Structure formats: structure tokens, C-alpha cells
Amino acid sequence: MSQQSHVHGVAGLKKHDIKVSGIVFMLYCLVGAGAFGIEEMIPESGPGMTLILLTVFPVVWAYPISNLTAECGSLMPSEGGVYVWVKEAFGEFWGFQAGWWGTVSTYITNGVYVTLVTGYVSQLIPMSEISLHVLRIGMVLIFTVINLFGIKEVGKVSTVLSVLIVLAFALVSIVGFMNWNTSPVEPMMPEGYNLLDSIGNGICICVWMYCGYECISNMAGEVKNPQVIPKGLMIAMPIVALTYILPTIAGLATLPSGSWMDWATDGGFGNETVGYATVLTQNLGNIWGYIFLLVAIVSQCAIFNTYMASGSRGFFVLADDNLCPRFMVRISRKRGVPYVGIISLAIVTLLLSQSDFTTLVSIEVVFILDLYIILSIAVIKLRKTVPVDERKKRGLYVMPGGKLGLIFFTSCPILISAVALLVNGTDYLMTGLIGTVTGPLVYIVFKRKYGGLSVDEPGRYPVNTSTKLAFGDIFRIGIFIFLLGSVTFIGQFWLRWYEIDYGGWTSSDYDMMGEFIPQILVIFKWAGLCFIAAGICIMAYGYKKDRPSSEEIVDYDYFIEKYSVNK
């Protein structure tokens, strides 16, 4: 085959026959891969509140996001997931923002899992700094090779790792329930905490523990029958929830009264803290602490494996739409996988796995919450683009509950994301908002340099020759700046009350810039006002000089056929 005949981009991807079970286990790895992380909630929120949050969040957070993903994925089972859905709803500017937020967040955090693995391994085997570097490189290389084989192999590895993790936490549940010792819900909250304190301390961790369902959609273009993804979502969600709730109840019930204050992510691994491993070491012997430490390593490997598969497709799809450097669109001849995206993610992971993650993760948190907000709004718009009746005629998945269901499924992620943004801390919000500004800046550069959607469909996506952007982009940028200013200005009132007047936070309560928080809040106030004013001016100018083109009447058959797996 000649170089010219080799197809790159989404059209050249190899499709795999992935069963529902494969999707379920990949989702399990993307979202949970065990209950590790919940340990930090227990002393911060209290045993009772932790269990309430773990039980409520599947209903008000995981179930809505799963349904949003299932409905959009059924309508548009395309590589790129949320990016494609937002692009079809609101155009390439907002689509790029969604793609940028989702992809950059994966590039930022994938190194966390490598660092956690090396930390766990060093508890088993004392290692020098050089040995740790070798271990990091070895881990990244192994899962890079697996990903280069394709998502079918990723799914097989995910299945094996998921089964091991589920069995381990099932054992924790069984042993804990058989050795019930105390009430798992007492106390409801830590002493001196009220309801707001308790919920505020746990909500961000709970959001983190139940996020990731949308990531599977990034690989939909490589699944022969992508309609298995909505089915997998509905099965994976309760499995994840049970893997969190049951072991946590069992652990709190079997460990001594008062030990809930000592829970930590490294608990039970030969130190003074406790955790899920302690349930086994206390009742079955110390050897089980080492066995469970291996499970913790497996868990982080499982997450890393699936996030490498999902995250490596982000820039690949943007490049296919001429919104990213074109070399990212290349795929391998034999396997039909986006090898440049996989290798680039591996390189960035190695570099960042040796860094301090505090600032990077603070940016990632805001990116993910922004992504859920815009996904919810896009679903509302797409309901108008392709009505429910048209979808049902074609046997596509539609969220239950009619209009009330739509309100529930879209409002819950928006409200919870907004709350999580404002209780995570001024330091995290500031770095996250600064990171968010990179989206429009990078879009302007890439759109002007590579042409965007107008390269392949100039009639549908015309370019304004004076700005070299899409018609209406100036107006959209104005909206972005206005929203950024509104969040900043309104948020500072809440943060000033929640953290200072009510909470009495000191500089030690912040992970970053604690001594500068009063000054940052002043900056929020005036910068927010400036951004609001600038956004209004830019919107007014854009509406007058760069008005968005009117929406076309949708040809439902063409729209659905465009993303049909059988096209």
C-alpha cells in the first residue's frame, strides 16, 4: 500500500467487535477501579455523611451523567465523544473548548497514577530514586504497548484487572460484614462540624470518585456496534456504586469505634492509619495487607491503562477537524490506532510523573467540571436539533422521564459542578480559571493556522476573512469572557463568606497561596467586573460586525447518517 493510499484520521480507524462486558469493565476502570480515595472522605465528612454522599451521588451525579453520555452516544456514536456532541450543538468554538478541557485534563492527571503505583511499590520493596525512575518508565512502556495494539486489547486487560479489583473489595465486604463490631454511621459528622462543613469537605472527593463515564465515548468510533456503550453505562454505574458503598460500610462496621478518624489512602499497609486493607489484616492476618497493596497497584494500573486509551483520542479528533497540528491525526497501518496520540500522552506522562501535581490537578478539576456543565447544556440543545420522536423511530436511546427527566438529568450535573467549583477553595478556583483561559487562546491560534472545520466543509462552516475565525466566534468569545467574569465576581462573595467569615480558614487550610487569599479575592472582584464589561462590549461588537450565521433546518436522516456506524 502506498503512503498516499493509507488513510489517516477517524476514517482510518480500525473497528473492533467489543462486547457489552468489555465496555462495562473499561468503564469500571475509567470511573472507579476500586474504592481507593474514599478513605480521605471519612475523617473529613464523618462516617455517616460519607455513606450518605456515596449513596446519594449515584442518583444525582453518576446516573445523570451516564444518561447524558448514553443519549448523546446513541445519537452520535463518534470518536471524540463530548467534543463532537458540543460541536454539533454549538459550533466548533465551544466544541474545541470541550475537547480541550477533556483532553488536557487527561494529559495532566495520567502521571498521578504512575506516581501512586511507584509509591505503593516502594512500600513493598525499598527502592532508590533511580529504581523508581526505571519503574515509572517500565509501567508507561507496558501500557503504551497495550494501547498500541488497540482498544480490544485495552478491554481485555481492563477485564482481567477489574475482576481482580472487584474480588478484592468483595472480600473486604464479606469479611467486614461477618465481623460486624460497631455502627458504621456514627458519628454522622466530625465533632464541631455542621451540615455545610461535612458536605463541603466530602463533595469534591465524591464528584471525583463518580466521574469518568463520558470518557468511554472518546473511543466510540473504534467500536463496531457503538450502541453497546449505552448498555454498558447502565450496567457499570451500579457496579461502581456497590464497589464503593459495601466495602465502606463493612470497613466502618468492623474496625474499632473511633478508628474512623484514622482512615487514609495508605491505611492498612504497615502504618498507624487504617483503610480497606485493615479489614483483612485485622481479621485474616498481616499477609493480607501485602496482598491488598498489590490490589492497590493493580487499581492504579487499570485506571492508567484506560485513561491512556481515552485521552489519546482527544487531540487526534481535533486534528482530524483541522483544529490541532496535523501530525496528531496519523494512525498505524496494521492496527489502525492513533499512535501519535498514544505516544505523546506517554511522553507527557513520564515528564509530569516526576512533578508536583497540586497546581496541575487544581486546573484539571475546573476543566472537568466545566466539561460536565457544557455537556448538560449541549444535551438540551440537541433535543431541539433532533427531537425525541425522530430518535425513537430509529431505535436510539433516549433518557427516561420526558421533559421532567431532561430537567433532572441536566440540572443535577450543572448544580453540583457549580457547588464543587465554589467549595474546592479559592486557590483551586483561581488556578483553574487561569487554565480555562487557555482554551480560547489556543483555539484562535489553531483555527487561524489550520483552518478548522471550514477546510473540509467551507459551505457549512464559512470563515470570516477579516478575523480568519468562524462567523460568530467574536460573539462566542465575548460570551466566554462574560461568563468567566461572572463566575469570578459572584464567586468572590461566596468564597469570602464560606472560607473567611463563616469557615475561619487560615493560610494552612489552603494547598497553594494561602497567605495571599485576601488579595486574590480582591483581584477576583475587580477582574470579574472588568471581564464582565469586556465580555459585554465584545458580544455587542461581535453581534454587529460578526453575527453568527442563522441555523439551518436540520435534515434528520442526514444528521443521523453522518454518525451512523454503517455508513
Question: Where are these predicted regions, by residue range?
Answer:
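Membrane-interface "cap" regions at the ends of multi-pass membrane proteins
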Residues: 1-70, 74-80, 89, 187, ...
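Transmembrane helix-boundary motif of multi-pass solute transporters/channels
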Residues: 17-119, 207, 213-216, 493-511, ...
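Membrane-interface loop-to-helix entry segments
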Residues: 118, 132-182, 193, 233-237, ...
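Hydrophobic alpha-helical segments and their helix-loop junctions in multi-pass secondary transporters
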Residues: 124, 163-190, 248-258, 372-390, ...
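C-terminal membrane-solvent junction of multi-pass transporters and transport-like membrane proteins
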Residues: 157, 193, 331-335, 372-429, ...
